[in-house]
């Protein structure tokens, strides 16, 4: 059975870095989906398709998104192509939203495999400051939200710590594959 790996975690936890590393592995059975976001693309940021709010609204009205949500004054969407990929037998990984996990679960049921990328508060603060996107007040708000969301995670979310070396996190992620045999057995 194919799986939709729903990667979640606070901003700055390293989701984009992990997705880039997974993409570089070129695993034949795992496709990395991109997101559509109403913010400009960044050189070091997430590999996404930048849309204006108007473009996003048109695509949303046309039903082009399998999943979509709003956070941090932006709209986010995952294209319906992921449904085709799953139907064709590929596992798919998406950069999801912690707040939208319940809706994703409703749409995908047992196909959904949520992984929460965790990181210590000190590492998260350091990463948020280093990327330079947020003010100190925004960083404080993101740290508070990260703690609140961590406390609300569903028990079926696999926790994947990313405090250390990205290669270690990538190896731990790979140990979860093949997903049909490992998806409920691993919790770090």
Curated annotation (Swiss-Prot):
Cellular-component GO terms for this entry: cytosol
Organism, scientific name: Pectobacterium parmentieri (strain WPP163)
Species classification: Bacteria, Pseudomonadati, Pseudomonadota, Gammaproteobacteria, Enterobacterales
Q: Does the keyword ATP-binding apply?
A: yes
UniProt keyword list = ATP-binding, Nucleotide-binding, Transferase
Q: Which GO terms describe its molecular function?
A: ATP binding; ribose 1,5-bisphosphate phosphokinase activity
Protein name (Swiss-Prot/TrEMBL): Ribose 1,5-bisphosphate phosphokinase PhnN
Top-level lineage group = Bacteria
User: What job does this protein perform?
Assistant: Catalyzes the phosphorylation of ribose 1,5-bisphosphate to 5-phospho-D-ribosyl alpha-1-diphosphate (PRPP).
Q: Which residues form a coiled coil?
A: none
Please name the NCBIfam families in this protein's record. phosphon_PhnN (TIGR02322), PRK10078.1 (NF007485)
**A Pfam family for this UniProt protein?**
Guanylate_kin
Residues reported in the UniProt entry to bind ATP:
9-16
Q: What class of enzyme is it?
A: transferase
């Amino acid at each position: 059975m194919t799986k939709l790996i729903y990667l979640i975690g606070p901003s700055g936890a390293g989701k984009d870095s992990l997705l880039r590393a997974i993409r570089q592995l070129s695993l034949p059975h795992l496709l990395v989906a991109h997101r559509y976001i109403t913010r400009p693309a960044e050189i070091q940021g997430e590999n996404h398709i930048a849309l204006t709010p108007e473009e996003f609204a048109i695509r949303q009205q046309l039903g082009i998104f399998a999943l979509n949500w709003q956070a941090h004054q932006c709209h986010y969407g995952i294209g319906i192509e992921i449904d085709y990929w799953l139907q064709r037998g590929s596992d798919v990984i998406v950069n999801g939203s912690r707040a939208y996990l319940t809706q994703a679960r409703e749409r995908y049921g047992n196909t959904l495999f949520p992984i929460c990328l965790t990181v210590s508060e000190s590492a998260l603060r350091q990463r948020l400051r280093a990327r330079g996107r947020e003010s100190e007040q925004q960083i404080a708000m993101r740290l508070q939200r990260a703690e609140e969301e961590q406390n609300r995670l569903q028990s079926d979310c696999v926790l994947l710590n990313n405090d250390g070396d990205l290669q270690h996190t990538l190896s731990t992620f790979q140990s979860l594959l093949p997903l049909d045999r490992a998806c409920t057995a691993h919790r770090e």
